[in-house]
Amino acid sequence: MNIVQNSIFLSNLLRSSPVFELKYDHSCELYRMSTYSTFPAGVPVSERSLARAGFYYTGAKDRVRCFCCGLMLDNWKAGDSPTGKHRNLYPSCSFIQNLSAVSTVGAASQPPAPLSEARSTHAQSPGLERSSYFSASYSSFPVDPVDFRPSPAMSPWRAGPSCVTMKSEEDRLCTFQGWPLAFPLPSALARAGFYYVGPGDRVACFACGGKLSNWEPDDDALSEHLRHFPDCPFVEGQLQATVRYTASNLSMQTLAARSRTFCNWPPRAPVHPEQLASAGFYYMGHSDDVKCFCCDGGLRCWESGDDPWVEHAKWFPRCEYLIRIKGQEFISQIQASYPHLLEQLLSTSDNTEDENTESPIVHFGPGEYHSEDAVMMNTPVVMAALEMGFSRSLVRQTVQSKILSTGENYRTVNEIVSDLLHVEDEIREEEKERAAENRESDDVSLIRKNKMVLFQHLTYVLPILDSLLMAGVLNEQEHSSIKQKARTSLQARELIDTVLVKGSSAVTIFKNSLQEIDPMLYKRFFVQQDRKYIPTEDISDLPVEEQLRRLQEERTCKVCMDKEVSIVFIPCGHLVVCRDCAPSLRKCPICRGTVRGTVRTFLS
């Protein structure tokens, strides 16, 4: 028998309200709430917050389960946030994603998503307040399938008349002299249009008269106002004044949410959390790493005197949040103060560094390395991986990569072991490539390593093609296929790739043909070994059409030969590939140096 159907009170309530048509399954928040009738009394987490986070009671100890993703949690401790734990442990859950979306200003302006996260409740009429059902442990109906918006037909939830005397935010703020809670801040409530009416934590909107109470720490005043009273004229005015922008992390869109992430901010860090949160940054939980909620740009290694807004504009000038708050003029001034930022970045890299030298991915400040390294490497999960026999240096580098990319350490042994095995496979593949290169003849290895430079400057392709055809290196089909390419650079690329595939004998014939047909290029490439700075031909005397064609070739990606180059490799500084081809390259195709990082450029 269904629990809700067994309840006389709930049945009478549903029959008396024609608006309500309740589903009898765990997707309904009211139904989930009804499963907590036998929930242990000593658990330090409220049944209401568990039901709101998508959990229903399993009947065993304090174990609960998500109706959507199946996540089971127990052993609740004081201070635990059911919504936060749900989001952290199973972020792909569609229910918890909807909760996150509703909590933002942008999302709240849309029709309410099912089972929203808001923890405040409409003020109840005296008749309903006397009922134990509408206690602090549960405070809202589900949005779907129940119509939860205030309407004249639902008198217990009807918004009161507007209060013209509270139109001023300052006047509203003065009413919070006896505010009983530390959250939300009175300034945030007043800014959201509310003034304090009591009793308890009840507030009312000056414009629509809507009343809310039973506030919890995670509540955002404006988001709650939007969710419960979307037709409020004050809310509509706020939405019209809001410039929409795309946020990379919706859960960090509010200042309060970002500020809460700084609870473990290093006390000796020279920049205050308030400054960082105001500039759009939230704390990643490691060292002094922060990220912008909007553009996802990350910054670290803060120094005394750093201004978060200036650093934001310096490194991420296209951030929509930055542009909206500070304006384009401020960003342009900061950018003008650092005209050679890209050159400085490239100059700090050592071009002569051995590609096999192990370099740490995360750079710690003075005196921080040993303590943070110890914390990072001595978690139970990491220690378990070390006990399996993985190299400590390999584990350290893998953990650092994880922290750098996600802001947190590994949570499970399976996850870290999977990544370690993947890294070992990559290392073995690189060793095989090096061994294969060593087995090849010197000429084959030379051309393979520098083929990008060679085919960029190989202009006499057709005579060499004919020579290789006569020598039997190419057949008629290969000769015709290469010859039909529209541009010389494409012909050169396919010719060299074909020769390399055929092996050392084909390379020898190609080398002899090049010596005969283009002795200048042969001398510079094979004799002088001047492969880094082969001068380009003076094209000033060529026809304008030919000059344009060659300039276009120089700006074309040397991998796909289609899109425009836009990625600079670090540390070598070569600009030869587009943004789509760059992620697949571990080594620069020009100098064969290991790619440590990339910078996107915009050619004017």
UniProtKB/Swiss-Prot annotation:
Molecular function terms, GO-annotated: cysteine-type endopeptidase inhibitor activity involved in apoptotic process; ubiquitin protein ligase activity; zinc ion binding
Keywords, comma-separated and alphabetical: Apoptosis, Cytoplasm, Metal-binding, Methylation, Nucleus, Phosphoprotein, Repeat, Transferase, Ubl conjugation, Ubl conjugation pathway, Zinc, Zinc-finger
Positions carrying Phosphoserine: S140
GO aspect biological process, one term: regulation of cell cycle
PROSITE patterns for this protein: BIR_REPEAT_1, BIR_REPEAT_2, CARD, ZF_RING_2
Cystine crosslinks: none
Keyword Cytoplasm: yes
Domain CARD: 439-529
BIR repeat feature ranges: 29-96, 169-235, 255-322
EC identifiers of the protein: 2.3.2.27
Residues noted as binding Zn(2+) in the record, renumbered to the chain: C292, C295, H312, C319
Free-text description of this protein's post-translational modifications in UniProt: Auto-ubiquitinated and degraded by the proteasome in apoptotic cells.
Domain of life: Eukaryota
Function field: Multi-functional protein which regulates not only caspases and apoptosis, but also modulates inflammatory signaling and immunity, mitogenic kinase signaling and cell proliferation, as well as cell invasion and metastasis. Acts as an E3 ubiquitin-protein ligase regulating NF-kappa-B signaling and regulates both canonical and non-canonical NF-kappa-B signaling by acting in opposite directions: acts as a positive regulator of the canonical pathway and suppresses constitutive activation of non-canonical NF-kappa-B signaling.
Quaternary state and interactors: Interacts with PRSS25; the interaction inhibits apoptotic suppressor activity. The BIR motifs region interacts with TNF receptor associated factors 1 and 2 (TRAF1 and TRAF2) to form a heteromeric complex, which is then recruited to the tumor necrosis factor receptor 2 (TNFR2). Interaction with TRAF2 is required for ubiquitination of IKBKE, degradation of NFKBIA and activation of NF-kappa-B. Interacts with RIP1, RIP2, RIP3, RIP4 and USP19.
Protein name: Baculoviral IAP repeat-containing protein 3
Organism (species): Canis lupus familiaris (Dog)
